[in-house]
Regions:
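Extreme N-terminal starter segment of soluble prokaryotic enzymes
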Residues: 1-6
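C-terminal non-catalytic interaction/assembly regions of soluble proteins
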Residues: 236, 253-308, 314-317, 321-327
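General small-molecule cofactor/ligand-binding pocket signal
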Residues: 30-32, 125, 274-278
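Conserved mixed alpha/beta catalytic, RNA-binding, or beta-rich assembly cores of soluble enzyme
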Residues: 9-30, 37-38, 43-48, 52-110, ...
Length: 334
């Protein structure tokens, strides 16, 4: 479900606005128009366009029904980059053309424009180079598989090379993401390429564009009032030493008595991942051989928190407990 704001400014535009509310009804829609054109109870009176657009710039999509100039002037103070901007599009009031303006790929504006165009019998005006040339788009691929793009610059370099019909090598360490057919298209003669793309949660050379899946889960523990920076540095160092990209972390787990531990909460916040906690009963119920500590067992009721917390979150423990300065970590992968 998407959060979508729709703006219209004329009588014809308001009629199309209502049509779009019905077409996109599976989403969370907020519809705005001038007070004199409110023809549906679902509409909200548009009093201040600039303030309303600003309030919706964290939405998934913004649709303007009217002139392109109105849309551009309305959004210009808030535009940042294609990785954070919402999908923004313009539709003329007669519903003839649907024009994506921002976030055609990452934000999904092109895809939404195609969908709306089909629904109202309008022509989507797609201007993205990779789309109109039928070229593999890194950002579209990454979005489809929920992958993190390691370098925006390298992503641009890859797109530019493909548009210039230069070969690019691509491989995947992830069984579920098969790129064999894509590899044949991007590098049909299997030559050594200057530009390489790798779908992986491992750390590669800085000149390789990695597309990183959220495939890693960690379990952690620490003594009370551990310094937050010390905790983050510890986790960073462990990941670097074992060649795992820290951006691949999907969630962090620990025992429930640590739910308010500042160091772990700050770690989760800095990595933008959820912090999950489990009771001692849940942790003790996990089967397997673990690096147990009698001191920890007497203190919290579980002989090993981090390894057990990993295996509640995922299937496989790939790195057993590592301890330093009252902190522990274990790592798993789906």
């Amino acid at each position: 479900m998407m959060n979508i704001a729709i703006f219209s400014f004329t009588k014809n535009g308001s009629c199309l606005n209502v049509r779009l509310m019905d077409i996109l009804k599976q989403n969370n829609i907020l519809s705005y128009t001038l007070p004199k054109y409110m023809i549906d109870d679902r509409m909200t009176a548009l009093i201040n366009l600039k303030e309303t657009v600003e309030a919706h710039f964290t939405d998934d999509a913004i649709i303007f029904i009217g002139a392109t100039g109105i849309a551009i002037r309305s959004i210009s103070p808030y535009v940042k980059d294609k990785f954070s901007d919402p999908a923004v599009m313009v539709i003329d009031e007669l519903g003839r053309y649907v024009i994506p303006l921002l976030s055609g790929h990452v934000g999904g504006a092109n895809e939404l424009a195609e969908y709306i165009g089909g629904a109202i019998n309008a022509t989507p005006v797609i201007t993205t180079a990779t789309d109109i040339n039928g070229v593999f788009a890194v950002d579209v691929f990454a979005k489809k598989y929920n992958l993190i793009i390691s370098s925006r610059k390298l992503a641009k370099d890859v797109s530019a090379a493909l548009l210039d019909k230069e070969p690019v090598d691509i491989d995947s360490d992830i069984i579920e993401i098969d790129v064999s057919d894509i590899k044949k298209k991007l590098n049909p003669t299997d030559v050594k390429c200057e530009l390489r793309v790798r779908i992986t949660d491992k750390i590669y050379e800085s000149n390789v564009l990695t597309l990183i899946p959220k495939s890693i889960y960690i379990g952690v523990g620490c003594k009370k009032d551990t310094d937050a920076k010390e905790m983050l540095d510890f986790v960073n160092e462990v990941f670097i030493s074992f060649g795992i990209d820290i951006r691949a972390i999907k969630s962090i787990g620990s025992i429930d008595i640590k739910k308010n531990e500042k160091a772990i909460n700050e770690l989760a916040k800095s990595l933008s991942v959820p912090f999950l906690t489990f009771s001692k009963e849940e942790l003790n119920a996990v089967e397997g051989e673990f690096n147990e500590s009698e001191f920890v067992r007497k203190t919290v009721g579980v002989g090993n928190v981090c390894e057990r917390a990993v295996l509640i979150q995922c299937k496989k423990l790939i790195l057993g407990k590592i301890a330093r300065g009252g902190m522990t970590i274990a790592i798993g992968r789906d």
